[in-house]
A protein has these predicted regions:
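One face of beta-strands
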Residues: 40-42, 92, 107-109, 152, ...
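Intrinsic, low-complexity N-terminal interaction/targeting segments
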Residues: 79-93, 412-439, 519
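Long, C-terminal catalytic modules of enzymes
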Residues: 211-225, 461-583, 589-591, 596
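Active/binding-pocket-proximal capping segment
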Residues: 370, 380-398, 420-422, 464-467, ...
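Structural boundary/hinge residues at secondary-structure and domain interfaces
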Residues: 22-139, 177-247, 256-363, 374-404, ...
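Bacterial N-terminal signal peptides that target proteins for export
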Residues: 1-8
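A conserved glycine-rich beta-strand in the N-terminal activation segment of trypsin-fold
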Residues: 135-211, 440-526
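Bacterial N-terminal signal peptides
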Residues: 8-17
Length: 625
């Protein structure tokens, strides 16, 4: 330990003696003090601007972030022990190193300082070397390095050693990432590739355990391959991610957030996504009642079909299952998916709305742009027949009963598909059917298909309100028109995205609570408001950009709903800023747990070693009986 402290002090002295340009870069100076090996950071260009934005957010939504006048400054004081001398207008950066290598003491705080004398006096800083201090007035070890107008704070001298003298993270970041950090928006950065490397063994172990638990469930083997295939797909997507960046902007009437995902070189998902052409079909105002969610996206038809076929082939041939499927079953399912996918055009829109009283919890509608309406009808018939055969091979019971609807909607013929499902433990068949009726109405899970010109409308559930309105909108000569709320959303999210999601947050939240079993009287009457939340996704070469806009009105109404249905949820943001129950007077710092318990036997090292802590002695061998 003494050797490590000496090396750290020497590095600090050398850096302080260097040219000013080396320690205080012109771009993002707080960020420039993080070492290259940082795997994540949170950068705030201005503390005062962030707290001003949070105060405006609290005034508009009622969701208070902290109780004090300066919640962020108070939070930093509790985490670092630095109570006085911090510049409330400066920039802040919090970096994170490898948790395994640094034994849970991996956090680096870079704070702006306006008065070094007040800072050191209030925290009882003792000089270790020029520019390096040990804080004696706080709970747990704290070390501070003076770097120009900034204080670098760590809870371990070994962590400080990794900071001082290391190559700056800014030199390793892409130029656009640095430019984003210099802007006036708080920014979060995560190197997903590094995190995957650090936790590779834990991730593999978790996946093996999770998939094993799936197969261990009674009567779950027929469905386990579906769930494991889904898990593999999510894991594959994450495995192709390289970095994630997020920036938050406070606007007068809402919050705007930008998210950027970069994929590793040669990622299959990037190759697929980069081929998509921009352009969005406007989400129609399909009903007078609020639509809880609407999703519309445009995909390149050839790439989309290729993706659907590759996913189907993987499910049929590579998904883990006790016995392989017969070739005849795989062939019919594959051909059905191919015919259906090739009949679709660029645009697909999904709508969800609360059902009318007595008609279940929700009603869903999908609107597909078609290349060939007749081929679409044939594809639906093939899908129904092929999935019946697949269900039989998986020891399920699934039959589709197709019948023409007795009453056409707006003069459009409707075909109804009634699936008959039976699976799992026989005693739960009735419970399963009751669950479907609760969700979708008296008919349970029912699909209705109507073709309107070059569009297909597919409805789920007994409530036909949204289904009828969508058909009427598509019959108009000028096509569907966006609702007023959607037109206002277009001011914040560009329409030339590949994927656009719009939500009425309180309606969507109320619908989700009802689906989860929350009593209707606790949910009460849901006010949809006049705005909608939007998520837009644009795919580029080896990257995806996500733009989000959350109006204050939607957040306020969602909070009012949560205060009735889940009052404990409204305290979650405030709990992050509550003072710790223990700590020194005025600082509120949570005492750090010791690396080793006081009574743990430790073998002293044979020689001074600045790189690794002393090993724990092995437990004595048991006596032979």
């Amino acid at each position: 330990m003494r050797t490590r402290i000496c090396l750290t002090a020497l590095a600090a002295a050398c850096l302080l003696a260097g040219p000013a340009g080396a320690t205080e870069p012109d771009v993002a100076p707080a960020l420039a003090l993080l070492p290259e090996e940082a795997v994540a950071f949170f950068h705030v260009p201005s503390l005062s601007a962030l707290e001003k934005g949070l105060k405006h957010f609290a005034d508009q939504t009622g969701w208070t972030i902290g109780k004090g006048e300066r919640p962020i400054l108070d939070l930093l004081a509790r985490r670092t022990g630095l109570v006085q001398g911090i510049d409330p207008t400066g920039s802040v950066c919090i970096g994170f190193l490898d948790p395994k290598r640094f034994r849970q003491r991996y956090t680096i705080y870079v704070l702006p300082v306006s008065d070094w004398d007040a800072l050191l006096k209030s925290s009882r800083g003792e000089v270790m070397s020029p520019g390096l201090y040990a804080l004696m007035g706080v709970s747990g070890p704290r070390f501070v390095a003076r770097r120009g107008k900034f204080a670098v704070v760590t809870s371990s001298i070994r962590t400080m050693d990794a900071v001082l003298g290391a190559r700056s993270l800014i030199e390793a970041l892409p130029a656009e990432t640095v430019a984003r950090a210099v802007s006036d928006a708080p920014m979060l950065y995560l190197n997903v590739d590094s995190v995957k490397t650090i936790y590779e063994s834990e991730i593999a172990s978790w996946f093996r355990a999770s998939s094993g638990q799936v197969y261990d469930q009674p009567n779950a083997v027929p469905y386990a391959d579906m769930l494991v295939t889904y898990m593999l797909g999510i894991a594959s997507f994450i495995d192709q991610m390289e970095t994630v960046e997020a920036a938050l902007k406070f606007e007068p009437e809402g919050l705007a957030a930008d998210l950027k995902i970069r994929f590793v070189d040669g990622a299959a998902v990037a190759d697929f996504l980069s081929a998509q052409a921009p352009g969005i079909l406007p989400i129609p105002a399909v009903t007078e009642q609020p639509v809880s969610s609407a999703v519309t996206f445009r995909l390149n038809p050839a790439r989309r079909t290729d993706f659907a076929l590759r996913a189907t082939r993987f499910f049929l041939e590579s998904a883990p299952r006790p016995e392989p499927l017969p070739e005849s079953t795989k062939k019919t399912v594959y051909e059905a998916v191919q015919v259906f996918a090739e009949s679709l055009g660029d645009h697909i829109t999904f709508l969800s709305a609360p059902a009318q009283p007595g008609m279940g919890v929700e009603s869903g509608v999908a609107v597909y742009e078609l290349v060939d309406p007749e081929r679409f009808r044939h594809g639906v018939e093939l899908l129904a027949a092929s999935w019946e055969g697949l269900a039989d091979q998986l020891n399920l019971y699934l039959k589709f009963k197709a019948l023409p609807d007795m009453t056409d909607l707006a003069g459009v013929p409707v075909v109804t598909y009634v699936p008959r499902l039976r699976f799992g433990i026989p005693a739960r068949h009735v419970e399963f059917r009751q669950r479907l009726r609760m969700l979708y109405g008296p008919e349970g899970m029912v699909y209705r298909v109507a073709v309107v010109g070059n569009y297909a409308v597919v409805a789920t559930g007994s409530d036909l309100t949204v289904f009828r309105k969508a058909i009427e909108q598509l019959q108009k000569a000028d096509g569907p028109a966006p609702s007023p709320a959607m037109r206002r959303l277009y001011n914040h999210i560009s329409r030339d995205e590949n994927l656009l999601i719009a939500l009425s947050l309180p309606v969507y939240l109320g619908q989700s609570l009802a689906r989860g079993g929350t009593a209707a009287d606790r949910i009460g009457t849901v006010d949809p408001g006049h705005e909608v939340i939007g998520f837009g996704v644009r795919f580029g070469k080896a990257e995806a950009e996500v733009t989000t806009y959350l109006p204050h009105e939607q957040i306020r109404l969602a909070r009012e709903l949560l205060s009735r249905a889940l009052p404990e949820a409204t305290d979650i943001p405030e709990s992050l800023f509550k003072p710790a129950p223990e700590g020194p007077p005025g600082a509120g710092v949570v005492p750090l747990k010791p690396l080793f318990p006081p009574d743990t036997p430790v073998v002293p090292p044979t020689a001074p070693n600045a790189e690794s802590p002393p090993p724990i002695a092995a437990a004595p061998a048991p006596r032979p009986k």
